[in-house]
């Protein structure tokens, strides 16, 4: 008898995922490193993130259906994403995970996937880094 693989989206559930994202963006809105690259009204950003994370975690392809292929790197190129900002983004997410009670192996694996994604989005050095030419 084979066991059905666990789908991360089913493990976290829509309600908890959406709560995570709402808490996350409440933190982003107050973060001095992140605030400059986000709009003042984060409702549309949060809506798209909910769609993306649903799909990212193996749920329905609701992001792609509305917006096409995620093309994360290309969609983030207009914004100056530094290592410092990537870390601030991850800290906001970690704090949001704490607040919704996300823990254990699921949290560890999910967070590590987000670390890889956040680092992939970096497109500029920190302001205090020397740029070699």
PLM regions and their residue ranges:
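Core of compact, soluble alpha-helical bundle domains
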Residues: 1-133
């Amino acid at each position: 008898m084979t066991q059905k693989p666990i789908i991360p989206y089913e493990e976290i559930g829509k309600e908890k995922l959406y709560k995570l994202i709402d808490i996350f963006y409440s933190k982003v809105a107050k973060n001095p490193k992140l605030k400059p690259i986000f709009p003042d009204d984060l409702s549309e950003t949060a809506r798209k993130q909910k769609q993306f994370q649903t799909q990212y975690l193996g749920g329905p392809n609701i992001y792609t259906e509305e917006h096409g292929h995620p093309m994360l790197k290309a969609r983030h190129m207009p914004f100056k994403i530094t290592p410092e900002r990537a870390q601030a983004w991850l800290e906001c997410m970690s704090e949001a995970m704490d607040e919704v009670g996300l823990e254990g192996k699921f949290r560890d694996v999910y967070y590590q996937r987000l670390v890889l994604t956040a680092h992939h989005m970096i497109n500029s050095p920190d302001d205090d880094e020397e740029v070699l030419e």
